[in-house]
Amino acid sequence: MALTKAEMAEHLFETLGMNKRVAKEMVESFFEEIRGALESGEQVKLSGFGNFDLRDKNQRPGRNPKTGEDIPISARRVVTFRPGQKLKTRVEAANTGK
């Protein structure tokens, strides 16, 4: 099961007593800030959570899996996420039942 933006807004409404509209706007604004920073080429560091980075990938040879035909995969910029140590520790603890 995936956590959605709507569920995040609902959680803000329930735990902080925010107006539902304000909670939804806050979640949207949070993700818009991340998108904007990445579009500007900036790294996004969320302390205790992890980092979103941009990585340039070179062009490389690929293959069409249906036809076996060689095709070039163009150079591109991708977003990567590196979880922070605190996040890793908490996820590992949750998965091992600690």
Curated annotation (Swiss-Prot):
The keyword Transcription applies. It comes from the Bacteria. One of its GO terms (molecular function) is DNA binding. SMART domains: BHL. Residues 49-70 are annotated as: Disordered. GO terms for cellular component: cytosol. One of its GO terms (biological process) is DNA recombination. This protein is one of the two subunits of integration host factor, a specific DNA-binding protein that functions in genetic recombination as well as in transcriptional and translational control. Heterodimer of an alpha and a beta chain. Belongs to the bacterial histone-like protein family. This is Integration host factor subunit alpha. It comes from Shewanella baltica (strain OS155 / ATCC BAA-1091).
